[in-house]
């Protein structure tokens, strides 16, 4: 009798995806982040579900319902901080996952990469709406500022903003719909992640060398299941350390003040994982230009496969491209720092230079360097 794992219609799918999947024998720990993102998503959905049982999406009671969760619900503080810091871990894994894709040329799997860009947008939208729900000062003003950006769209801008708000300002209608969308989007993200995996398994995984690994494959289980478990242990170690020792490290103190439309915080800023895009937005004096730059800062990822001019897939054997890649990483860290600073000298000019460098590196310098490396190798 054959194994049920290989014959049962449902088990067969799981078997081909996580057990008997042929995987390259040389993939490094940079390939752990896909599974870590899956774990993060499960943590977020489960903690979010329990939070939703106690949360009320009304402007009068939202803030106090979050306080009630932290004070009165059994382990409510743990669930709330796991959810808040779980989002930070999610984005750390996301950025590392995208960085890995850029470095090793994984973007040449076009369908997988484009679904990934779509996933990034969906997760960012989910996180933004989640930040509004506690209805603190930064929640309210963050929602007001970011949704207001849509008014820069010609002709339909102001109507669109009012339509999203459900009125003439961010109010009860806005909070209710944001809660509804924040609840449904993670399930859409989970479905998209399934499609992401489907497309990945059509081609098989890339590997650090960027060369075909068809001649040297090993089964996913037990080799990479054990390797992934190590990554999961590190994830849990960092997440639990954050939650139990410094749960508010990555949050904003202003969000412990209930939302007040009559009092603007001195410095409105989003969560840390949006700061790089926020810095790019602020570096352009024109409103519409800023919004376009903000969208392009993420959408530029979709153009990367078109800008691949190298005859090698991976950056493993391309030292000049490696230099530019790490300059890009440093530039993104600089942008993240600038996004959290007030709009004054010297931060304005640093932000503008870092924004120009960001687009220059991706759109111009990296493709030119790849051509140069091709010529150096006399190909």
Curated annotation (Swiss-Prot):
Give the residue spans that cross the bilayer: 33-53, 77-98, 113-133, 178-198, 226-246, 288-308, 320-340, 347-367
Q: What is written in the cofactor note of this entry?
A: Binds 2 heme b groups non-covalently.
The protein's topology relative to the membrane is: Multi-pass membrane protein
Principal localization reads: mitochondrion
> Binding of heme b b566: at which residues?
97, 196
Q: Which InterPro entries match?
A: Cyt_b/b6_C, Cyt_b/b6_C_sf, Cyt_b/b6_N, Cytb/b6-like_sf, Cytochrome_b, Cytochrome_b_C_euk/bac, Cytochrome_b_N_euk/bac, Di-haem_cyt_TM
Which annotated residues bind a ubiquinone? Answer: 201
| PANTHER family (alphabetical) | CYTOCHROME B
Family from the record: Belongs to the cytochrome b family.
Q: What is this protein called?
A: Cytochrome b
Q: What is the lineage of its organism?
A: Eukaryota, Metazoa, Chordata, Craniata, Vertebrata
Q: Which gene encodes it?
A: MT-CYB
């Amino acid at each position: 009798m054959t194994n049920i794992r290989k014959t049962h219609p449902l088990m067969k799918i799981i078997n081909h995806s996580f057990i008997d999947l042929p995987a390259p024998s040389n993939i490094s720990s940079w390939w752990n982040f896909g599974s870590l993102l899956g774990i993060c998503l499960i943590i977020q959905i489960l903690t979010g579900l329990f939070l939703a049982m106690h949360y009320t999406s009304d402007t009068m009671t939202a803030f106090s319902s979050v306080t009630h969760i932290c004070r009165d619900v059994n382990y409510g503080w743990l669930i709330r901080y796991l959810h808040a810091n779980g989002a930070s871990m999610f984005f750390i894994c996301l950025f590392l996952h995208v960085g890995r894709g850029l470095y090793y040329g994984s973007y040449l799997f076009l369908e997988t990469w484009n679904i990934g860009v779509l996933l990034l947008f969906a997760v960012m939208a989910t996180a933004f709406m989640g930040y509004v729900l506690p209805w603190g000062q930064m929640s309210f003003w963050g929602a007001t500022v970011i949704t207001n950006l849509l008014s820069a769209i010609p002709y339909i801008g102001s109507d669109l903003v009012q339509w999203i708000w459900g009125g003439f300002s961010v109010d009860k209608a806005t909070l209710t719909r944001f809660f509804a969308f924040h609840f449904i989007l993670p399930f859409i993200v989970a479905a998209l992640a399934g499609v992401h995996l489907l497309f990945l398994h059509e081609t098989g995984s890339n590997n650090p060398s960027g060369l075909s690994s068809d001649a040297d494959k090993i089964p996913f289980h037990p080799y990479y299941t054990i390797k992934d478990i190590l990554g999961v242990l590190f994830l849990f170690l960092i997440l639990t350390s954050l939650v139990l020792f410094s749960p508010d490290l990555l949050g904003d103190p202003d969000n412990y003040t209930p939302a007040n439309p009559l009092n603007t915080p001195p410095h409105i800023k989003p969560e840390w994982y949006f700061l790089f895009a926020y810095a790019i937005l602020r570096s352009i004096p024109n409103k519409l230009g800023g919004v376009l730059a903000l969208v392009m800062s993420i959408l530029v990822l979709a153009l990367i496969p078109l800008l691949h001019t190298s005859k090698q897939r991976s950056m493993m054997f391309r030292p000049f491209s490696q230099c530019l890649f790490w300059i890009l990483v440093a530039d993104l860290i600089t942008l993240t720092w600038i996004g959290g600073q007030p709009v004054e000298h010297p931060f304005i000019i640093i932000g503008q230079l870092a924004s120009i460098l960001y687009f220059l590196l991706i759109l111009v310098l990296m493709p030119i360097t790849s051509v140069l490396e091709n010529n150096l190798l006399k190909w």
